[in-house]
Structures are given as C-alpha cells and as structure tokens.
C-alpha cells in the first residue's frame, strides 16, 4: 500500500501495523529477492534475519518450493497459504510432557553442561507444578535470555529470564536472585502473575506471540523475541523426541 497519511507510509513488522516517514522507505521491485525472508529446506522452514542468522520456525509447508524465498509481514500469512508455528502461539499455561531427566539431557545435547542451569530439570518441573507454567517454555526462555545459563547476568545475579534487564542498563538494572533455584522459581511466579494469568497490563495473551499479541508485545522490544523462544522450543522438541507435539 503506497498511500501516505500526513507524509507517512503504513508498514507491518512482526504482526504490528504502524507508520514511518515516507523519506525513510525505499521501494523494492517485487521481483527482487532480499533478506529477511522465509525459506524451506524440505524438512523445516527457517526465518532468515540476515545472511548469517536464521531460526527454525516450522515444519516444511507443501505450498513452499525448497530453497525459494518467501515473504510475510507477520510470519503466518503468505498470500496463498499460512504457516503453522508449533510453539509461538501455544498456551504457556500448560504442562510439558518432558521430564526433569529429559530437560537435563537437553543441556547436554546443547553443549551447555557448564552453564548454571545444567542439572536443574527438577526445578523447572517444580516451577511448572507450582505455577502452571510450561517447563519447556521456561527452559527455552531462559536459554534465549541467559545463553543457556552462561551470560554474565546469569552468573552474577541468577537472573535467567531478563527480568528488569532494560535495554539501556541491562546489567545494572537486572533483578538479582539469591540462587539458581530461586532464579527459576521466582521468575516463573513473576511471569505467571504479570503475563500469563494476569488480565490487564502488561499481559496480552498467555502465549509468546509477536508484536501484535502475546508476551512479545510488552515483555521485549525485539520484534522476533517470541519467535526466537518458540524456535528453541521447536528445536528442543525435535531433539528430545517430539513429546510435546
């Protein structure tokens, strides 16, 4: 849509519609390929953020040609077909079929046995039991925010979920927890109360979502934050035997 409103052009990114100044937009020929895009290798679909960075987001869609780039403003609607994301819009107030032993094995598979979260499968399952928050989601969220328990904030503050780690002052403002277990259990409680069971701000749905709905609206500024966590859940589910889907 090339129509302008007061010199601004409507755009859509990660499901959110907004406006930018027309002088900040460059028109691209519809026959030109560019990145970011979505591409299938015949088994999985990847969202390529750049030439060097991509995440696995879905199973191959039969409407897609292998290796051909596809484009979408929300990652779901592709004109003639829709892409099914296994975990991005799934209910996080649910129980994972993975056991504590499965979760511990995942850290080994990911080469993260030297991180602070290794061996904490029982604590993730305890958080799931106590607060009703999906354990696989908690593992994936903490993996993204803390680099599988190896970030400096994780090491120094037992903060594995980016709580209060604001963009301008991530380290200094990040909440500190007494130990690893309280970092997991405390975060699960906080996330549930604020984003999952809550019906007011900042909650926008008990799922990861994108910038239009779900946790991604207010939990993180990054437009593909929800997709990135869902991708980790998807990859983990593949590695551990597809018990959750």
What do the PLM-derived regions correspond to, one by one?
Residues 4, 8-15, 21-137, 148-245:
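Catalytic cores of secreted/periplasmic lytic hydrolases that degrade extracellular macromolecules
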């Amino acid at each position: 849509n090339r129509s302008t409103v007061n010199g601004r052009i409507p755009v859509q990114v990660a499901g959110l519609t907004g406006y930018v100044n027309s002088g900040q937009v460059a028109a691209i020929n519809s026959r030109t390929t560019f990145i970011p895009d979505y591409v299938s290798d015949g088994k999985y679909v990847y969202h390529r953020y750049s030439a060097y960075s991509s995440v696995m987001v879905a199973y191959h869609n039969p409407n897609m040609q292998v290796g051909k780039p596809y484009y979408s403003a929300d990652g779901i609607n592709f004109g003639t077909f829709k892409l099914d994301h296994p975990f991005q819009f799934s209910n996080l107030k649910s129980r994972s079929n993975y056991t504590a032993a499965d979760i511990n094995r995942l850290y080994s598979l990911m080469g993260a046995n030297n991180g602070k979260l290794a061996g904490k499968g029982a604590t993730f399952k305890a958080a799931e039991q106590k607060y009703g928050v999906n354990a696989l989601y908690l593992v994936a969220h903490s993996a993204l925010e803390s680099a599988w328990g190896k970030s400096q904030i994780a090491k120094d503050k037992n903060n594995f979920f980016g709580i209060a780690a604001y963009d301008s002052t991530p380290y200094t403002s990040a909440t500190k927890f007494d130990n690893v277990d309280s970092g997991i259990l405390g975060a699960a409680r906080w996330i549930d109360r604020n984003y999952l069971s809550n019906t007011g701000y900042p909650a926008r749905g008990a799922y990861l979502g994108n910038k239009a709905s779900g946790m991604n609206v207010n939990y993180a500024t990054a437009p593909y934050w929800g997709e990135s966590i869902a991708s980790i859940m998807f990859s983990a589910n593949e590695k551990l035997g597809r018990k959750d889907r």
